[in-house]
């Protein structure tokens, strides 16, 4: 399960992309799977770019350092290391999903690695649903699995402040088409969302203090 509700102080850059959402996966026997995890890899370091003290309501962040050495300093080497271990190149993947705190970070990282828009556009949902933090990459993967065909190869890379990235090399199996119609697609959930204005958002998130 990967899910979260993004927090951001009013007026902070974090609030601009704040979202909420999650995705859950059942991990089981390969013969029953709609996608196989072929290999995983992690890249971690002691890089504090985002934090919240126990007594504070909103998190703090290191502003531009959240990009580099934070995001780019982990997502890019994690993806590169996993492809090196697998002996693959960007051209070997039909789809790619990166952690997406905003649209600029993942597209820049993906272009740096040599991926194309056709490979990442299906799973890049942040422009429509915002930054779901721990759920970001996993929700993006659901959108990809909704349309993937048997044999399609997928690269997914997460990111967590602190900091670290986990990479996953996945392959869709022949069973993928059997499960794609058993539940509403991620795209259908997005298309039926209800837009609200900022005043409604502030009230629903209880950002107005009355004392």
Please give the residue ranges for each predicted region.
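Glycine-rich phosphate-binding loops at beta-strand->alpha-helix junctions
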Residues: 96-108
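Short, hydrophobic/amphipathic alpha-helical packing segments
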Residues: 72, 76-79, 134-138
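Beta-strand segments within the central parallel beta-sheet cores of soluble alpha/beta enzyme folds
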Residues: 1-2, 36-40, 91-98, 119-125, ...
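Condensing-enzyme catalytic core mediating Claisen C-C bond formation in acyl metabolism
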Residues: 8-69, 73, 156-162, 167-211
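Active-site-proximal alpha-helical scaffold in enzymes
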Residues: 1-4, 9-10, 17-19, 25-30, ...
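Hydrophobic alpha-helical scaffolding
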Residues: 61, 65-72, 95-99, 127-134
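A beta-strand-loop signature enriched in Asp, Gly, Thr, and Trp
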Residues: 108-140, 144-152, 156
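Phosphate/pyrophosphate-binding loops at sites that engage ATP/ADP/AMP, CoA/4′-phosphopantetheine
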Residues: 76-94, 113, 147-148
